[in-house]
Regions:
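Walker A/P-loop-proximal flanking segment of P-loop NTPase domains
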Residues: 1-73, 147, 151, 405
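Conserved NTP-binding/hydrolysis module of P-loop NTPases
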Residues: 81-120
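Sensor-1/coupling segment of RecA-like P-loop NTPase cores
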Residues: 166-174, 179-213
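Conserved small helical "lid"/interfacial subdomain of P-loop NTPases
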Residues: 220-248, 266
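DNA-binding patch around the recognition helix
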Residues: 374-384, 416-417, 421-459
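Short amphipathic alpha-helical recognition elements used for nucleic-acid or partner binding
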Residues: 381-412, 428-430
Length: 459
């Protein structure tokens, strides 16, 4: 918490990844599970799976912050944690080969920087270079990483790859080269990966390919799910604001359940109301629900697409007037893992008022046998990828004003931001999904020499 010109900052206002390890809250059991894998001989690869804004990136930053004075996994001097966000490379579209090039350049640079070495990297070829030359340069960058590892025999390299879905969209040699580092007889027992994904790895590639012995994805024997917070974590989080009383904390718990993002949203609005109690508490509650509604709807949509269940699953969870079917129960278990539902002797119930309200307002999905809804009906939210959704959400929060490229990058990628061209690709993909005519955008426009602006009248 800080002060600016005498105005106390909202300690729950920043819901971007936590960079300062002193502000990282809890997840002790999850960290212990990761460390158990990393301290094995040889270290084991680990996949962290969780919804958007569940704290995956913050956990990677926390691992990377390990020091001799504050070790996280046993001997801090043993581990080196190079970090790369693979998300931007997934959004390069037809430039996938160049995506592999940028990924390996960033991985080599992160490896050198983790050891405070100069990043003397091979020169990248021009955009119009032949495919074979790109592969040669990627291989040279991979060899650079190998050489760094080979020269530092007293370190174990744990590569932190955020949004590993990006790797699945790159040429297969990218994943093959990553696996080869773990198979090298000289360095393989000092290399492992901790990756994050918003979806189980089994959904990134065909099952047959995942089971291939030579597959990079076969390195991840198990996945750890980043779910709801426990009571101690929630209590520690709310201690950031001593202005809150016990009734406020109970109110926040009722609104957010045990879900990190919804607790932060609820806490931010309750905190503001406590300091400036204008209007009624209902106004603060409605504001929190309104802010979280798009995110809750996207979570529900992803769950119902992943699990086979009828639209009655939502009504069953809200009304609690019948026992759920086995398919519906699978959805409720998934909600429970996310801190959004609880089970007691009476059955399942929603643990978060925010989520319950978002579901009660969610229109049923139409049957595939019905004609499409008329044009006047409310539009279905665009099926954004994780990064597209993050960029769009930021632009929507700042609708009506120009956001510079650097401003967008700092908000979404506090560490390892993408190039301007990679950001432009993401913008173009967003336009494809929200513009009637993407070639002549009217909603998401570029302001020459400045940045991007989402018009206020955008749905």
């Amino acid at each position: 918490m800080s002060q600016n010109a005498g105005v106390r900052m909202n300690p729950f206002g920043n819901r971007k990844p936590v960079i300062d390890p002193r502000l990282f809250i809890g997840r002790r059991s999850l960290i212990d599970a990761v460390c158990e894998r990393l301290t094995a001989a040889p270290p084991q690869c680990c996949a962290l799976v969780g919804d958007a804004r569940s704290g995956k990136t913050s956990l990677l930053y926390y691992l990377r912050s390990s020091t001799a004075a504050r070790p996280i996994c046993a001997d801090a001097t043993r581990f080196v944690f190079p970090y790369v966000n693979a998300g931007p490379y997934a959004d390069l579209g037809a430039s996938q080969s160049h995506g592999a090039l940028y990924f390996w350049r960033d991985l080599a640079r992160a490896t050198a920087q983790a050891l405070a070495l100069p990043d003397d990297l091979p020169t990248l070829p021009d955009q119009g270079i032949a495919e074979a030359a790109i592969v040669d340069t990627v291989y040279a960058l991979k060899c650079t990483v190998e050489d760094i590892i080979r020269r530092t025999g007293d370190h174990t390299f744990i590569f932190l790859i955020d949004n590993v879905e990006g790797i699945a969209r790159l040429p297969r040699h990218t994943a093959s080269f990553l696996r080869s580092l773990t198979q090298d007889p000289d360095i393989g027992d000092r290399v492992a990966y901790v990756v994050t994904s918003s979806t189980p790895l089994s959904r990134l590639y065909p099952v047959s390919e995942l089971r291939e012995p030579s597959s990079f994805w076969g390195l991840f024997a198990s996945e750890l799910f980043i779910g709801g917070l426990d009571d101690a974590d929630i209590a520690a989080l709310l201690e950031r604001a001593p202005e809150l009383n016990d009734a406020d904390r109970a109110w926040i718990r009722r609104l957010g359940g045990a879900n990190l993002t919804l607790i932060l949203i609820a806490a931010a609005h309750v905190y503001e109301w406590r300091l400036h109690p204008t209007g009624s508490p209902d106004d603060a509650e409605r504001a929190a629900i309104e802010e979280a509604r798009p995110l809750c709807r996207s979570w529900w949509r992803e769950l119902t697409e992943t699990h086979t269940a009828s639209v009655d699953a939502r009504q069953s969870l809200i009304d609690q007037n019948r026992a759920p079917t086995p398919d519906e129960a699978a959805i409720f278990e998934a909600l429970h893992a996310r801190g959004l539902a609880q089970r007691d002797r009476h059955g399942w119930r929603i643990a978060s008022t925010i989520f319950a309200q978002a579901l009660s307002d969610q229109p049923d999905r139409p049957s595939t046998s019905l004609p499409p809804p008329p044009a006047a009906a409310p539009a279905t939210p665009p099926a954004f990828t994780h990064l597209e959704g993050e960029v769009y959400a930021f632009l929507r929060e700042n609708a009506g004003r120009v956001c510079t490229r650097d401003e967008v990058k700092r908000a979404i990628w506090p560490v390892s931001p993408p190039s301007d061209s990679a950001l432009q690709k993401i913008i173009e993909r967003i336009r494809d999904k929200i513009e009637p005519d993407p070639k002549h955008p009217r909603k998401l426009i570029a302001v020459r020499g400045q940045g991007y602006m989402l018009r206020r009248d955008t749905d």
